[in-house]
Structures are given as C-alpha cells and as structure tokens.
UniProtKB/Swiss-Prot annotation:
The gene is atpG. Coiled coil: none annotated. Keywords: ATP synthesis, Cell inner membrane, Cell membrane, CF(1), Hydrogen ion transport, Ion transport, Membrane, Transport. GO terms for biological process: proton motive force-driven plasma membrane ATP synthesis. This is ATP synthase gamma chain. It comes from Campylobacter jejuni subsp. jejuni serotype O:2 (strain ATCC 700819 / NCTC 11168). GO terms for molecular function: ATP binding; proton-transporting ATP synthase activity, rotational mechanism.
Length: 294
C-alpha cells in the first residue's frame, strides 16, 4: 500500500511539472512569434544598410588609404594584430536547452586560438549566462551587460558598440568581433561570427542602373553611415539572439513536456501493476483464510 502511495505521489508531481513546462512552451511560442517578426524587420534594415555601403564602396576604395582621416581608420586592417575585442551574447534566463553552449564553446575556442598566437583578447559579455560562466572560469571580462539580451534596447546597444569603436579609434584594440547564436527558423539556431571592425570595403563598382544618388560626397557620408552601420549591427544581433533564445526555449519545454508525458505513462503502468499485485495478494490471503477455517 505504501508503494502505491509513493507511485501516486510521483504521478502527481510529474503531472504538475508537465503542466508547468507546457505553459512555458506556450509562453515561449507567443514570444517567439513577436521576436521572429522583429528579427525579420531588423534583418531587412541591416541588409539595406549593407547595400548602401556596397553602393558607395567604390568611393571608399579611392580614399580608404587616407590615414589622416579618423573616419577612414575604421577601414584600415592593421598589419600586426595585438589586441582583439570579442563581444558575445548569451541568455539572461535559463531553461533554453543548449542555446548558450555553441556561443560559449566558440568564445572559449577563440580565446585559446588567439592566446596561442600571443594575441590579447578582451571579452565584452552580454547576458547573465556568459558572465557567470567566465566568472566561474576566473577569466576576466572587460565589460558586463545584464538584462540586455532579454530586453534589447537600441540606446544600450549603441552604448556597447560605441565603447568598442572608441577603443579601436584610440588604439586600445585592433579588431572587434561580434558572436551570437542567431535565429534561422523555429527549430534551428545558427551561430554567427561578425568581424565588425575594421570594415572591409566591398570590392564592387557602383552599377549603372543604381537608383541611389549620393549627396554629399562619400567622404561626408561615411561618418553617419558607419555610425548607423555599427549601431544597427549590434542591435540586430541582440534581436536575432532573443528570437533564437525563444525558439530554443520552446523546443526545450516541448521536449520536457513530452518526457513528462512519457514518465506519467510509465508511472501509471507501474501503479496499475502494483495495484493488481496488491489485489491479487489480498485475494490469496482471503482464500487462504477461508480454507483454513474449513
């Protein structure tokens, strides 16, 4: 009887867990739809900025070797790389399966790779998971940003990327790389590594049928264009990462719900078997008692 009570208690516990994971799955599904739409819109805008950059690339190529213009230093790849800044995004919350693993593994591998080349790598961490992981590994973080990956904010994204751009312009770093796990579709996430700074001018010419007219000239346009380019790449990465996080959490909760269902089924079978054995034992005892009274 005590065994039956224990199994019944387990069934109730697992069933409650199933309800919780199913509710979290539904919440993640709703959030995913919203984040997916935001990611799609942001991607289109980011692609348009890149197209504009491609359109004026022929002008950039003409003036990119002008070392005196600070704006153009963002296009100069340094001959010797001594310091690299790595911005990476992880989730602020858990229960999202292996969403963070790809990013953390890639960042750890890049750390080893650059250290083997005697290149100093500085980490700018966005998201509680990544911050706690490298704190546990006792690896120093240059900057830590909490609550940004779970609630992308354009002004905060600008703050992150402006700090990296300023460090590049001031000679504190030679390269800036952005790493995040991005959204591909509802069941797949895709690791993205963006070598953000220095920018490589596109090796194409302006097309004859282009509808874009440049006013003012490329040198005057670069400052505002590059500012928007960096800011929106950072902001898009945050939105893209959030959509991927919701996708991963939806899958994780779906798997947990299915596992809970399977476990409840197993426990019900165990309960029925134990109950059947208990009834059989009681019947045998009753029959034995009747026989002994004859």
């Amino acid at each position: 009887m005590s065994n039956l009570k224990e199994i019944k208690r387990k069934i109730k516990s697992v069933h409650n867990t199933q309800k919780t994971t199913n509710a979290m799955k539904l919440v993640s599904t709703a959030k995913l739809k919203k984040a997916e739409e935001a990611a799609k819109r942001s991607k289109i805008y980011a692609q348009k900025i890149d197209e504009i950059l491609s359109e004026i690339s022929f002008q950039i190529n003409k003036i990119v070797h002008n070392e005196d213009d600070v704006r153009l230093s963002l296009f100069h790849k340094k001959e010797q790389i001594k310091t690299v800044d790595l911005i990476f995004i992880t989730a602020d919350k858990g229960l999202c399966g292996g969403f963070n693993i790809k990013t953390l593994k890639t960042v750890s591998e890049m750390l080893k790779e650059y250290e083997a080349k005697n290149i100093n790598i500085r980490l700018r961490a966005i998201g509680k998971t990544g911050i706690e992981y490298f704190n546990f590994q006792k690896i120093e973080l240059l900057e830590k940003y909490f609550h940004l990956s779970s609630s992308p904010d354009y002004e905060k994204a600008c703050e992150v990327i402006h700090a990296a751009v300023d460090d590049f312009l001031n000679g504190n770093t030679d390269e800036v790389i952005l790493v995040h796990n991005g959204y591909k579709n509802m069941i797949t996430q895709e690791l993205k590594i963006n070598h953000l700074i220095p920018v490589e001018p596109k090796s194409i010419e302006q097309t004859h049928n282009s509808l874009l007219e440049l006013e003012p000239e490329g040198t005057e346009l670069l400052k505002d264009l590059m500012k928007t380019y960096f800011e929106y790449n950072m902001y898009y990465a945050l939105i893209d990462s959030l959509a991927a996080e919701h996708s991963a959490r939806m899958q994780a909760m779906d798997n947990a719900t299915n596992n809970a269902k399977a476990r409840v089924k197993q426990l019900n079978l165990a309960y029925n078997k134990a109950r059947q054995e208990s009834i059989t034992t009681e019947l045998i005892e009753i029959i034995s008692g009747v026989e002994s009274m004859k």
